[in-house]
């Protein structure tokens, strides 16, 4: 067998690429992962590590287009768009605007909630069965509101949505939040506690995924910057990288947003 060929060639060694590799290896496939840096670097390494079925609401909702446009004035905005209107960006904004309605919002909420709930339980099973040492905690997540205005807005667009989905969200008074988290500055308006949420240490999680991939016989090529992808018709025939030329019966693109 050609050592550079595998059943599945995965481009990108972040959390998605490594998780795909692990499940494919368990299914009996031979797998090779190409990663331009080191396994799990980038955004898979540095993030808050929360696992949140409570975040079922999509970004596209009525009123959000105005938020997106106003964010162009603040480089530190949570949703920031560079105020440069080229073709692709304008098409994205128009598509985003078309989905900022309640019909699409509720349809997306139901689909996202189903995926989030299933993945939350699958993740717990994976961490337990493969003994992944990543500081996984199922203690829930607490969200704190400093003002009543923000709390009331989140009640309409967040907590009430979760109620309809059957996702538990516990409303807390300000004094209850302060009792739960004594280090908070007094004057909290209220809070939401999501007992179904979880968290982990993302850098440890991706390192553990990489460990299990190697233990099960998978290959991870670090420093493999992709130079070119050769195609024939609608199939990828070869992937040329700084670590060599590779191929696979199937190719998984897990290269991230950038």
Feature roles, as predicted:
Residues 153-164, 184-250, 254:
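Helical element adjacent to the flavin cofactor pocket in flavoenzyme catalytic cores
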């Amino acid at each position: 067998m050609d050592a550079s060929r595998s059943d599945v060639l995965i481009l990108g060694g972040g959390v998605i690429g490594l998780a795909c590799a692990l499940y494919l290896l368990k299914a009996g496939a031979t797998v090779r992962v190409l990663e331009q840096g080191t396994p799990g670097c980038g955004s898979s390494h540095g993030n808050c590590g929360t696992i949140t079925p409570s975040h079922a609401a999509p970004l596209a909702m009525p009123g959000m287009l105005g938020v997106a446009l106003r964010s162009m004035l603040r480089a530190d905005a949570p949703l920031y768009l560079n105020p440069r209107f080229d073709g692709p960006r304008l098409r994205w904004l128009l598509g985003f605007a078309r989905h900022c309605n309640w019909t699409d919002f509720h349809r997306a909420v139901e689909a996202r909630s189903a995926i989030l709930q299933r993945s939350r339980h699958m993740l717990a099973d994976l961490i337990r069965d493969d003994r992944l040492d990543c500081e996984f905690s199922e203690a829930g997540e607490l969200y704190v509101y400093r003002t009543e205005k923000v709390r009331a807005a989140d009640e309409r667009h967040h907590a009430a949505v979760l109620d309809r989905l059957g996702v538990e969200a516990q409303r807390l008074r300000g004094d209850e939040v302060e009792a739960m988290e004594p280090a908070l500055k007094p004057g909290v308006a209220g809070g939401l506690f999501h007992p179904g949420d979880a968290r982990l240490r993302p850098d440890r999680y991706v390192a553990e995924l990489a460990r299990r991939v190697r233990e099960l016989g998978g290959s991870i090529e670090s420093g493999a910057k992709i130079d070119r992808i050769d195609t024939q018709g609608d199939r990828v025939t070869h992937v040329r990288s700084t670590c060599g030329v590779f191929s696979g019966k199937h190719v998984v693109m897990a290269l991230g947003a950038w």
